[in-house]
Design a protein with these regions (language model features):
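Conserved acetyl-CoA-binding loop-helix of GNAT-fold acetyltransferases
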Residues: 186-212
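Conserved GNAT acetyl-CoA-binding A-motif
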Residues: 182-185, 212-227
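Conserved N-terminal entry element of GNAT/NAT acetyltransferase domains
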Residues: 1-28, 32-39, 44, 95-112
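Active-site rim helix/loop that mediates acceptor-substrate recognition in acyltransferases
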Residues: 40-77, 81-120, 260-261
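An acidic- and aromatic-residue-enriched active-site/binding cleft used to recognize and process polar
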Residues: 83, 138, 189-191, 223-230
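Accessory, usually C-terminal, subdomains that scaffold auxiliary metal cofactors
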Residues: 224-281
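Conserved acyl-donor/pantetheine-binding loop and adjacent beta-alpha core of acyl/acetyltransferases
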Residues: 86-192, 246-267
Length: 282
C-alpha cells in the first residue's frame, strides 16, 4: 500500500494483520495502551501492593488474546507498520519482530514505579507494528464463553455493553446483518507509545472505511468508543460515508445503575456507539 493511497509518510505502510504473531503484537499494543494511557482503564484500575500495572497488562493480554485472534483471523483487521523500524535485538530482526513479555511471571513488581513498568514493557515490544484497527464480520460473532475471563477481570466491559444496548433504540431489522459481508464490527484500536500525534488512528480508520466499502463490500461499520479522539474521527467520516452517533452517555452519570457508576469511578469518559453507513440500502 503506497503512501499516496494512505496519506502516511513513505516509511509507514498499512497491511492486513495475519497469523498468531500479529494477533499477539496487536494484543500487546491494545493492552499496553489500555493499562497505561486509556481514559478509562488507566483511571479506574488502580494498582495495589499486590497488583502492579505489569500484572494487569499480563492478565489483560491473556484474557483478551482470544478476542484479538478472532479479529485478526477474520482478515478484516489492519495495522500500520514502520518499514524503517530499528530492532533492539538480533532475534527480533531475524524473525521480523517479537514480543518479550514474561507472561508466565505473576510475581509482584509493585515496588517499581509506573513509569519504569511502562517503559520496560514498551522496550519488550520489539516489533514494527505501530498502530492497529481491529475488526470482524458481525455475522461471525465472538464466543461469549471465551470472553468471560476478560469480563471477569474487567467487569466494566460487560456493564458498559449492557448500558449501551439499553440506550440503542434502533430497529434491529434496519441495520443488523442478515448474512456475512454486510456489517463490520470494530473491536479495538491502539497506537504504540511514542508514535502518537502522527494521525495514525485517523488515517487507519478512514482507510478501513474505504477498503470495507470498495474491496470488502460491507454496507456499514459499527464501533463502540471510550475515547474522545476515536469518537471524533468515526462520527465525522470522509464523503461519501455518513455517520450516526447512536448512543452517547457518561457512565458516572447513570442514575439507574449504581454498579456501572462504581465501575467507572475515577473516569469522566463519554461512551459512544457510532454507525457508519458505507452504502445506501437497496
Amino acid at each position: 500500500m503506497t503512501s499516496d493511497e494512505t496519506g502516511l509518510p513513505p516509511r509507514y505502510e498499512i497491511r492486513t494483520l495475519v497469523g498468531p504473531e500479529h494477533a499477539k503484537w496487536a494484543c500487546a499494543l491494545v493492552t499496553h495502551c489500555s493499562i497505561f494511557a486509556s481514559p478509562v482503564f488507566s483511571k479506574v484500575h488502580t494498582t495495589t501492593s499486590t497488583q502492579s500495572r505489569t500484572q494487569l497488562c499480563y492478565a489483560m493480554f491473556r484474557t483478551a488474546l482470544y478476542q484479538m485472534s478472532h479479529q485478526v483471523d477474520s482478515g478484516l483487521s489492519l495495522g500500520i507498520f514502520d518499514t524503517e523500524y530499528q530492532f533492539k535485538r538480533h532475534v527480533s530482526a531475524e524473525t521480523g519482530g517479537k514480543l518479550y513479555w514474561d507472561l508466565e511471571n505473576d510475581a509482584s513488581t509493585s515496588t517499581r514505579s509506573e513509569q519504569f513498568e511502562d517503559q520496560l514493557l514498551l522496550e519488550q515490544m520489539d516489533f514494527p507494528l505501530v498502530s492497529v484497527a481491529l475488526a470482524y464480520d458481525s455475522f461471525c460473532p465472538l464466543d461469549p464463553t471465551k470472553l468471560q475471563p476478560l469480563y471477569d477481570l474487567f467487569p466494566l466491559i460487560p456493564l458498559r455493553n449492557k448500558a449501551t444496548d439499553k440506550r440503542d433504540h434502533r430497529n434491529p431489522a434496519e441495520w443488523q446483518a442478515t448474512g456475512p459481508g454486510e456489517v463490520l464490527f470494530r473491536g479495538g484500536t491502539a497506537t504504540k507509545a511514542g508514535e502518537e500525534g502522527k494521525g495514525f488512528m485517523k488515517k487507519l480508520s478512514w482507510y478501513m472505511m474505504r477498503k470495507a466499502a470498495a474491496d470488502w463490500r460491507f454496507r456499514g461499520i459499527q464501533i463502540g468508543t471510550v475515547h474522545d479522539a476515536v469518537s471524533s474521527v468515526w462520527s465525522r467520516p470522509p464523503a461519501p460515508f455518513t455517520a450516526e452517533v447512536v448512543v452517547r452517555f457518561k457512565c458516572k452519570d447513570d442514575d439507574d445503575d449504581e454498579e456501572l457508576r462504581k465501575c467507572f469511578e475515577g473516569s469522566d469518559q463519554e461512551v459512544t456507539m457510532i454507525y457508519v453507513t458505507l452504502k445506501a440500502p437497496n
